[in-house]
C-alpha cells in the first residue's frame, strides 16, 4: 500500500508540475511533500530544489492530512485500523500521525510505521523520477 501510494503521489506531483509549466526546481521542491521535513529537505537539496518551498509544502500537506483524515476515513468507510493508520502516515507524516494516535493505538502505530517506510520509498523513487 505504501509503495503504491508513494509512486502515485510523486508521479501525480510530477505530472501536475509539468501540466502547469513549473520549472524543474519547483517540481523537485514539491515532489517530497508527503514525508517528514528532514527527509523532504534532503531529497530537495540533493536534486536542486528550493528548501523553503519544500518545507512549506510538507507542513501544508501534514496539516491538511490531519484535518481531513478522519472525515475521509469515514467517507470511504475504512473500518480496518491498520489501513487507516497506514493511509494517514503515508499521506500526512508526523502531523497526521498525531491525529492517528487520537483515533486509536493501532492507527497510531501503523501511521508511525508508514512514515518510515514511505521515507525510504521517497528517497528511492525520487532518484528514479528525477533522473
What are these regions (language model features)?
Residues 1-5:
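Short, small-residue-biased leader/transition segments that mark boundaries at the very start
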Residues 6-18, 37-41, 62-74, 94, ...:
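Transmembrane alpha-helical segments of multi-pass membrane transport proteins and ion-pumping complexes
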Residues 16-22, 30:
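Short, exposed beta-strand "edge-strand" segments with a Pro/Gly-rich flavor and a Y/T-containing core
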Residues 20-22, 48, 77, 130:
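Short helix-capping/hinge motifs at transmembrane helix termini and TM-loop junctions
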Residues 26-55, 59-60, 79-117:
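Alpha-helical membrane segments and immediately flanking helix-loop junctions
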Amino acid at each position: 500500500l505504501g509503495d503504491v501510494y508513494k509512486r502515485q503521489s510523486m508521479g501525480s506531483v510530477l505530472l501536475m508540475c509539468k501540466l502547469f509549466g513549473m520549472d524543474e526546481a519547483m517540481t523537485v521542491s514539491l515532489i517530497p511533500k508527503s514525508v517528514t521535513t528532514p527527509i523532504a529537505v534532503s531529497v530537495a537539496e540533493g536534486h536542486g530544489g528550493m528548501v523553503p518551498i519544500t518545507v512549506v509544502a510538507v507542513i501544508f500537506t501534514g496539516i491538511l492530512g490531519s484535518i481531513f483524515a478522519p472525515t475521509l476515513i469515514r467517507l470511504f468507510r475504512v473500518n480496518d485500523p491498520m489501513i487507516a493508520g497506514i493511509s494517514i502516515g503515508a499521506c500526512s507524516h508526523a502531523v497526521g500521525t498525531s491525529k492517528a494516535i487520537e483515533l486509536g493505538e493501532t492507527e497510531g502505530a501503523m501511521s508511525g510505521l508508514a512514515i518510515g517506510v514511505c521515507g525510504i520509498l521517497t528517497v528511492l523513487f525520487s532518484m528514479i523520477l528525477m533522473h
